[in-house]
């Protein structure tokens, strides 16, 4: 069996510690280099009532659950991987890519979309909206995004989102198209990877989705025909019993394999193939939609005034080296001129202002007759 198959097998609650130790030995046989320093120190957390959560003791005596190990390695959460597996190298982290491809693990691409959406909402708070007014305002503040989506609407090309909903362009306005797509997101999803995990097929698990958007159109959403883990109807209907969003802060139950086993959100997926998973996706905001579609590069100020200003700035930037050269030449010429005026013109002026020296020749000597002298 593969690494992710064996890792998935220990993502559950055990009746005793010994059973986990046995399964972990099989996991170690398929563990790639760089990860054994943690996985060879198995431990459990006693949940009471004959229930034990499997996990591992880190060098700082911190306990990390098998569910968390599954989550960070399946989703390629590199910062968390480095935090747990101290001293691991880039090639060792990269070795997981091939292992994910072998088992069609889809989590990494979904993690990228989610992380990108979070970054969009943090950097561009105006996109963290779900209302028509908020979406319209955000589009006006990000005209490049608006222009791109208007072009997509004109082309009439629909896009499949991570949660199985579609962004289609059939409403009267772009804002209406976006709002309809946002309304159709949020819930518990059964996800199956293919093409090395690059492609993911997702469908909505209605019985695990405890709060849907009131405007969700289920005819536009892929709904799972059956639950992949539970076939008993009464058991499925009981999942959302007593649900309270204000307390639980999520729209799902039994949809998070890495959740605390004592919480209503935990689900045991150890029987699923490694290329399959159940996950909760919270209702999208505009920022989540942008991150899902990978359009974050179109964000930023460049409105009509901005475009004109940016255009002028672009021309100025191109001419700036020439302007500096001309300025330097003119400055040098001015310096030379001032030096010339001081040394040459200034010296001539001093001579002119001095009183002139007139050399008068002495009078000629004339011999006069004595009579003329009388």
UniProtKB/Swiss-Prot annotation:
GO CC terms, sorted: membrane; viral envelope; virion membrane
Subcellular locations according to the entry: Virion membrane
InterPro entries: Baculo_ODV-E56
Topology in membrane: Multi-pass membrane protein
Keywords attached to this entry: Glycoprotein, Late protein, Membrane, Transmembrane, Transmembrane helix, Viral envelope protein, Virion
Residues modified by glycosylation: 183
TM ranges: 155-175, 319-339
Family annotation (Pfam families): Baculo_E56 (PF04639)
Residue ranges, annotated region (Disordered): 355-374
Main location: virion
Domain of life: Viruses
Similarity-based family: Belongs to the baculoviridae E56 family.
Entry function: Structural protein that is specific for occlusion-derived virus (ODV) envelopes but not of budded virus (BV).
Note: Expressed late in infection (18 hours post-infection). It remains detectable up to 120 hours p.i.
Protein name per its UniProtKB record: Occlusion-derived virus envelope protein E56
